[in-house]
From Swiss-Prot:
It is a multi-pass membrane protein. This is Cell division protein CrgA. Involved in cell division. HAMAP family: CrgA. It comes from the Bacteria. The gene is crgA. Keywords: Cell cycle, Cell division, Cell membrane, Membrane, Transmembrane, Transmembrane helix. The chain crosses the membrane at residues 31-51, 70-90. It holds the Pfam family CrgA. Belongs to the CrgA family. It comes from Mycolicibacterium paratuberculosis (strain ATCC BAA-968 / K-10) (Mycobacterium paratuberculosis). The lineage of its organism: Bacteria, Bacillati, Actinomycetota, Actinomycetes, Mycobacteriales.
Amino acid sequence: MPKSKVRKKNDFTVSAVSRTPVKVKVGPSSVWFVALFIGLMLIGLVWLMVFQLAAVGSQAPTALNWMAQLGPWNYAIAFAFMITGLLLTMRWH
């Protein structure tokens, strides 16, 4: 059986550059950031509770008349506060 020819190897082979991405270390979030997103979630919760318990009905106090006039928009406002706080928790370190 005939023998196959042996190929010559190059003296210098160029290796592919392999870089692994380095994760940047980020420090912990500041105290005000944590207070902000917890505060926003609590504001939304309190808004919803006040609307449900005090601003609805014929016995609503006159101080909360403006809230009763908003009607169903109170749900949107309360959930907007809560969702904003929830979205900020994703940036928390």
